[in-house]
Each structure stands twice: as structure tokens, then as C-alpha cells.
């Protein structure tokens, strides 16, 4: 049997979609899922009926719940688990990684409690033995799985890794991969946009309209850029796929869980009720707390993120948060 060239860890909607994209090109791909019962269903159905119904698996994609089997002799590993599971996933995988393995992730978030970027977590856990890379950009899983045109950014600490992995994923007809040497900026864009998307959803849930949504996206981009520059990112990253691209998609399309969560809040649901109504992980909920703490540590002003935090964690009404934002002192753009 041919050794898989790519293993994707995490069989949710996005992990499954990425695995399909690799396998669609004929690349031997393994998708690992934690839940053995759900994996057995996928093995029988040849699709992920729970998250991506009617998206059949290519012949070169296999699914397993055996982590050792999934990682054996694999060169390219892509982690796609929620940010709160990222550290534990790496610790579980580390002793099973091949000596030559390179590790990428498509997780968008910060480490809970510490607020560290995920590359810091990966470096601490894996050391310098394995090259690292991150995938980020404006993508919805269902559209990727269906082969609809998509573009993302990929950044790495190792140029050979990013060139090879981007080449495996890139497809002239449906999937364009842009490489980017801003390892910090590509990661940060995927985090902050989740928070701003909650705000955009709240504004629409309240009924504020397109003008307010556009203003919020624009000023949200300014907040992202301020924080990114303070952390050493490049400003041009935030006008690319991993910044503005992801921000626009997540703030304007109802496929976004973060946006739908915000809309539910704007329509009067409480935080817990709104979270339950989504039915899947809402990364922006945790991201909000972590981003606000990160900004405070670095003395970066992020008023939109701060007001969203007040709604999620301090019981402020969304309407009052909007009033407080609009009542801020006028200033030069």
C-alpha cells in the first residue's frame, strides 16, 4: 500500500474539506477523527454525512480513528481542530510523528488562557525538529468540498515545506494558494476576523443595515492592523487573503458561524442560547476574550473588540455596545 503523503487531523467540516481537496488531486490522504463511531459511519458512507453531506470522498482518501496509523511515516501533517484542543492534539501526536514530518495547521485561534499565537504553542511542543506552516484565508468548508473556486494564504518557517504543501493543495481550476512570508500576520488575521464577524452579525441582528456593517468591517480591519503591527506582522498581509479577504467573507455571509452567533445576539438571544443555536464550535466566542487580553498586554486600542467582549462576558446589551461605539470621541481616520 502506498504511504499517504498527507494526513489531516480533525474530521470536522473544515478538516474533511481539506482532506477532500488533497485527495481530489489523487494524493494519498488520510483523515483522522477522534470519534471511532463517527469514523466508522464515514468509512461506510464514503462521506461525512454529519458536516458535509453529498460531498463524496475521492478514492485516494481514507478515514481512520487510529492516530498511530494516521501518522505512520507521513511527511505532511495538517492539524484542523478547535483552538482549545490544539495544544493537546500536538502533544498526543508528537511521539507518533515520523522523524521527517512537517506540521501545518488551519486552526484559527489563540491558545486559551495564555493567549499565545498557535505557532508559539507548536514551537514549544514540537521544538525545532519539525518545520511548521499555517493555512488561512476566506474559505467555507462546503464550497471547498464541492470544488468551487477558492483562494487561501499559506506561510511557513520553512520555504521548502510551504512550496511543497502549497503545490499539493493548489489546483488551477478550483484552488489557488498564495504563499506569504508573514508567519505572524497570516495567523493573526484568522483570529481577529472571528471577533469582528460577531460584531457584524450583531449589527445586522439589531437591524442597522449595510452602512453600519461596512463601517464595522473597515474599522475592524484597522484594529487588526494595529495589533498586527505591534506584534511584528506586515501591514500588507492584512489587505490580502488572510486579512481583508477572510474578514469580508466571515462578516458578510451567513455560512459563518461567528456571524450567525452575532446575529442571534443582536436579535435578543442570550449568549448560551445563541451558542447552542449554532450547533458547532464558535471560535470567535473564545477568541474575543483572548484578543482583548492580547491587545491589553500590548497596549493596543481595539474598541470594537472591547465592546464585543463586554456583550459576551459582562452582560452588556448589544444595542448599548453599539451606542457606546458611536458615542466615542470623533477623530481623524
Swiss-Prot record:
Residues that coordinate or bind NADPH: 13-14, 34, 108, 141, 257, 283
Matches recorded under Pfam families: NAD_Gly3P_dh_C (PF07479), NAD_Gly3P_dh_N (PF01210)
Reaction it catalyzes: sn-glycerol 3-phosphate + NAD(+) = dihydroxyacetone phosphate + NADH + H(+); sn-glycerol 3-phosphate + NADP(+) = dihydroxyacetone phosphate + NADPH + H(+)
SUPFAM superfamilies xref list: 6-phosphogluconate dehydrogenase C-terminal domain-like, NAD(P)-binding Rossmann-fold domains
Top enzyme class: oxidoreductase
Chief subcellular location: cytoplasm
Record pathway: Membrane lipid metabolism; glycerophospholipid metabolism
Record GO cellular component, one term: cytosol
Any single GO BP term: carbohydrate metabolic process
Function of the molecule: Catalyzes the reduction of the glycolytic intermediate dihydroxyacetone phosphate (DHAP) to sn-glycerol 3-phosphate (G3P), the key precursor for phospholipid synthesis.
Family: Belongs to the NAD-dependent glycerol-3-phosphate dehydrogenase family.
Stated name of the protein: Glycerol-3-phosphate dehydrogenase [NAD(P)+]
Annotated organism of origin: Idiomarina loihiensis (strain ATCC BAA-735 / DSM 15497 / L2-TR)
Gene designation per UniProt: gpsA
